[in-house]
Each structure stands twice: as structure tokens, then as C-alpha cells.
Regions:
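Acidic, metal-coordinating helix/loop segments flanking the phosphotransfer/catalytic sites
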Residues: 33-53
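Two-component/phosphorelay signaling modules centered on CheY-like receiver
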Residues: 10-35
Length: 108
């Protein structure tokens, strides 16, 4: 079972990512378990779940994507990380500690 976390304060964007993965992905829907989070705080509360893939919004109220990933990597170094952003501005922390697999731009 592939555990995929989607951490974004925009519910519509979370649904969009799920839809793309379900319709275009290589795994069938019964091989995927989605976990949705509205904030970095919520994701960190579930840190005991070792997600395989994490889609992380860069800009959220409270803990932003960078701060969340810095803390999350203490629990889960192996997860594949994809940063999602409306603007492309990676920081040294997000690159070095987060070690993202990809940055993807949100539709504006």
C-alpha cells in the first residue's frame, strides 16, 4: 500500500492532486491510501505514519512548507517530497534538508 500525504490549506487543490494520481498514476486506487492535511501542524501530528510520498504546499498559515518539512524529516527521511507552490522560490533549507524530488507550480 502506497501512503500519500497531501498537505495543502486549499481543499480543491488537494482534490485535484488526488484526481490526477488516481486517473493518471501507475497504481490502482486499491493500492493507494491518501492522507489529507490542511496544515503542517496536522501533518506533524500524524508523524508516526511513514508516508511514501508527500505533496507539500509551500505557503500555508502557521507552519509553512519549509518549516514543516524541516521537522518532518526528523521522523521520516525516506519519503519522496514534492513541493507545490504558486511561485518558485526554494530556500537553502528546503533544498538541503527537505531534499525535494520535485517542485511543481500550482495553476494560478
Amino acid at each position: 500500500m502506497c501512503k500519500i500525504a497531501i498537505c495543502d490549506d486549499d481543499k480543491e487543490y488537494r482534490e485535484k492532486i488526488k484526481t490526477v494520481i488516481e486517473t493518471e498514476g501507475i497504481l490502482s486506487s486499491n493500492e493507494i491510501r491518501f492522507y489529507e492535511y490542511e496544515s503542517g501542524k496536522e501533518l506533524l501530528e500524524d508523524a508516526d505514519i511513514l508516508h511514501d510520498l508527500i505533496f507539500m504546499d509551500m505557503r500555508m498559515p502557521g507552519l509553512d512548507g519549509n518549516k514543516t518539512v524541516l521537522k518532518l524529516r526528523e521522523y521520516n527521511e525516506a519519503a519522496i517530497l514534492v513541493f507545490c507552490s504558486g511561485c518558485f522560490e526554494p530556500t537553502p533549507d528546503s533544498i538541503n534538508v527537505g531534499q525535494p524530488f520535485r517542485y511543481i507550480m500550482k495553476d494560478l
